[in-house]
Amino acid sequence: VSDDRPITVLHLVANRWWTGSAEPVIRLLLGLRARGHRVLLGLIPGDRFEQKAREAGLEPLADLSLEVRGNPVHALADLRRVRQAIRAEAVDVVHAHHSHDHWLGWLGRGRAGLVRSFHNARAARRDWPSTWLYRRTDALLAVSHEIEERLRRVGVPPARLSRVDGVVDLARFESGDGAAIRAEFALGHAPVLGCVARLAPRRGHELLIRGFQQLLPEYPHARLLLVGKGEARARLEALVSGLGLTREVLFAGYRDADLPAVLQALDAFALMGAGSDESCRAALEAMAAGRPVVGRRVGALPETVVHGVTGLLVDDDRPESVAQALRALVAEPERAAAMGRAGRDRARAFFGPDAHAAQVERVYRRVLAARERAR
């Protein structure tokens, strides 16, 4: 396959929500399209992901359900629809993002190449049907070294594995004004630390809160802004109340349209857990907004944050360690601002839609060249 011929790619995404793989997939499709490729999208219709895809100018395939727990009749109808689309649209590559659509893509691929993205380590399964499928997939993409190593351990040939960086909408997060957010929460000129993450178990909010608490004797005017919604909110609010921090720790709820402004209101960003998207997109958004990042060594954060340059990495789960990192940025605002600028430069260089799409495009061309040689 020539290096300049446009590629037609069918992305299958068994996701209905605006979480996990959803936004990275849309950013990738837009990046591929901007590079001259033709992109098709199959998704679960009727929910937030479809709404966001259409808002981005992407028209999902019709007559496709992708229901993970659908009945066999729906599954067979989906297989027929995928096969028909691959033939009618002359699809070169089928790119799956979840286990369900991975199997569907393998069964319906015909002569097209098959690529699978893994957005979190839990998706890399160890059971024999999954490992059998992985070894018969042309390329597997991991958004972190942790996922890459897990796939190696289950027997995926190294030649089929590729590590790809996360992706962020640079244009959206490089602009914004935090003044309205500071006014909304009466933050004034206080040093403000923030976290954008679902309020759920294993996201590290308790660790962050307890680390922040240790900062307050030296910096009593500091504030912690927790952005997000989720089932753990009541528990976290009870923790904050029990620690006597209801004035210092603020719950901002779920923010979407004004998220860039929220990030601009922060002096530093903190993320203690990776969630369902282990590229840690929230940290990438903070970097694009010019905020320094404090993060635990989870997901792709060790590859995203350059310790001492774009932020600080915490090596363990002790509140004392988190407090030390937060204190370093609050104590030296000029250093924190310089880290934020370096983070923005790094986001522009490596994590924009074009850079991400170029990485994936190289994988596609390698897959197609190998399949051409094998014919």
Identify the meaning behind each predicted range.
Residues 173-187, 259:
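A short helix/loop element that forms part of the nucleotide-sugar donor recognition site in Leloir-type
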Residues 96-102:
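Short His-centered aromatic/hydrophobic patch
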Residues 42, 292-295, 305:
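Short hydrophobic beta-strand element within catalytic cores of glycosyltransferases
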Residues 6-7, 11-74, 160, 231:
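N-terminal strand-loop element at the rim of the active site
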Residues 19-30, 191, 195-214, 231-237, ...:
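A conserved mid-protein helix/loop that constitutes part of the nucleotide-sugar donor-binding site
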Residues 307-308, 312-319, 328-333:
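Conserved acidic donor-binding segment of nucleotide-sugar-dependent glycosyltransferases
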Residues 113-145:
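A conserved, positively charged/aromatic
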Residues 232-235, 246-255, 262, 312-313:
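Active-site donor-binding acidic/aromatic loop of nucleotide-activated sugar
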